[in-house]
Amino acid sequence: VSKSSAVQSFLSQVAATPNRAGNAHLIFALDATASREETWDVARQLQTEMFLSARSLGGLNLQLCYFRGFAEFFSSRWESNADEIVRIMAGMSCEAGATQIERVLAHAINESQVRSVKCVVYIGDAMEENVDVLASLSGKLGLLNIPVFMFQERDDPGARKAFMECARLSGGAYAQFDQASVSHLKELLKAVAVYAAGGFKA
């Protein structure tokens, strides 16, 4: 996982956040296109770890979103039970298609109009869209105080540049997502879950 100043700053911010009860909502979005199929089992294990770590945090509601295939975009119901999200994720499979990051960001903005969306976590490996459009949406999320945490699988330079820009403009953070960084990634994902719940538990 990238030990960037943005990520470290975020972890410091989480540690300083007072614990409080709340009704926070976290959107967890996945690229489920064919390019991720090779590493999907490992990714699913790590993604599941995040939800299980979030289960003990009070006041946290989760929504799973993913895109794949020909313009297929799925968003689950809001769930306070992480097991239900894990069940949905267990049945997922990858299908060839273009990325729909724009749709993820627009969905987060729309959801924020009716409920308290605390942050967005996105995991993907590619970006095949208009960077300016993604930047505009990320900036809007930043104005809404909804940071986007971008985790990148593989090392595509174009995707990395776009992911880092989305994270910067929204006030979030960027990190690598790969098998070699499991321990640090779990630390970051758990920190994101705690941040979304509105507090930090040592």
Task: Please provide the spans of the model-predicted regions.
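Von Willebrand factor
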Residues: 1-76, 81-123, 127-132, 154-164
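Structural recognition of the beta-strand scaffold that forms the well-ordered cores
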Residues: 27-28, 121-122, 147-151, 175-176
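Catalytic-core regions built around general acid/base machinery
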Residues: 50-53, 136-145
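Active-site-proximal beta-strand/loop segments in catalytic clefts of secreted hydrolases
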Residues: 65-68, 123-125, 151-154, 177-179
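Short, structured coil segments at secondary-structure junctions
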Residues: 144, 162, 169-170
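C-terminal "exit" segments of structured domains
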Residues: 170, 174-202
